[in-house]
């Protein structure tokens, strides 16, 4: 009895990316990049964690996402482990901030160590119920759990969702052990 399941492949012999399409969000056109930068309403310096997530979005590692999850997708993921399109996502992909002024419809130039890495078109901003997120995603609210500790102690007050346009990959430091 053969138990091996055949997987659909593309013409190159590779399995298709999750969600069916690899999302490369890096803008190569310098004029378009400069135009997007000039339209930024705000400039935010990313934490290392946010910069890592921006990089993962830019290179398609979070495909089929084209940016940070909006409030509807966030709620769907923490409650159902699926985005609003029904695709499995175990954890929400969010950008956090303490900025009270930014609102939907505005754009944020994302920098990391002064490097212009991306533009975020804000489609959604909300104040998450972090205790619910911790409980549903990690099964606990205990700060002994490193991810719960990160949610409560490192993430900003607000989550911001929206489309990301990548400019250049952030130059990240090595993880300290």
Could you tell me what each predicted segment is?
Residues 118-126:
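Short beta-strand-centered aromatic/proline hotspots
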Residues 2-4:
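Non-catalytic accessory regions outside enzyme or core folds
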Residues 94, 109, 121:
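Short, conserved beta-strand segments within well-ordered enzyme catalytic domains
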Residues 140, 144, 148-155, 159-173:
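Catalytic P-loop NTP-binding/switch module of NTPases
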């Amino acid at each position: 009895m053969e138990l091996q399941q055949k997987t659909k492949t593309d013409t190159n012999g590779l399995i298709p990316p999750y969600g069916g399409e690899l999302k490369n969000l890096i803008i190569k056109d310098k004029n378009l990049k400069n135009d997007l930068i000039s339209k930024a309403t705000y400039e935010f310096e990313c934490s290392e964690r946010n910069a890592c997530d921006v990089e993962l979005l830019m290179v398609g590692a979070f495909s089929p996402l084209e940016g940070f999850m909006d409030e509807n997708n966030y709620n769907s993921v923490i409650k159902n482990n699926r985005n609003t399109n029904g695709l499995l996502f175990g954890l929400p992909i969010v950008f956090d901030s303490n900025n009270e002024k930014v609102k939907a419809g505005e754009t944020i130039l994302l920098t990391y160590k002064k490097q212009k890495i991306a533009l975020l078109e804000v489609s959604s901003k909300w104040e998450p119920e972090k205790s619910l997120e911790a409980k549903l995603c990690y099964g606990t609210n205990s700060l002994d759990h490193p991810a719960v500790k990160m949610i409560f102690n490192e993430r900003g007050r607000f989550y911001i969702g929206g489309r990301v346009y990548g400019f250049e990959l952030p130059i990240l430091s090595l993880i300290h052990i």
